């Protein structure tokens, strides 16, 4: 019985984050997974999808007033993306930790401000909105 209680407690203490591998970078999927794994993150869900323009608008609605918004949305629809839900137990600020990993990957593999390998949610509210674009049951 102790094992069941421990498993329930551990599952309740898991933080989840949403990450999207942008068009043109699907070849880095394993690299991204391995980098997250180095810090104790595991993939709980993943999917690939070619976004519709309306979905890209949903994904980046916080940037709708920015000059780059139209180009960013068009770029995100240009080819297949791969989305991930990563999870990790017992972490205080998952979005801060993931931002550090994201910036490291962008620095190493990014080609420009827009073609910067991946996007990650910066809050629970953003994650709920963004993950729903890729995962039906979110």
Q: Where on the chain are the PLM-derived regions?
A:
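Non-catalytic terminal and connector segments of soluble metabolic enzymes
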Residues: 1-138
């Amino acid at each position: 019985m102790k094992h069941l209680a421990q498993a329930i407690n551990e599952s309740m203490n898991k933080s989840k984050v949403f990450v999207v591998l942008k068009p043109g970078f699907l070849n880095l999927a394993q690299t991204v997974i391995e980098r997250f794994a180095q810090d104790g993150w595991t993939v709980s869900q993943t999917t690939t999808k070619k976004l519709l323009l309306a979905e890209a608008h949903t994904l980046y609605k916080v940037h709708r007033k920015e000059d780059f918004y139209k180009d960013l949305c068009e770029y995100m629809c240009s080819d297949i993306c791969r989305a991930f839900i990563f999870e990790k137990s017992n972490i205080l600020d998952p979005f801060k930790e993931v931002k550090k990993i994201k910036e490291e990957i962008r620095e190493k593999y990014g080609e420009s401000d827009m073609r910067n390998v991946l996007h990650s949610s910066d809050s629970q509210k953003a994650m709920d909105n963004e993950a729903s674009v890729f995962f039906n049951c979110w």
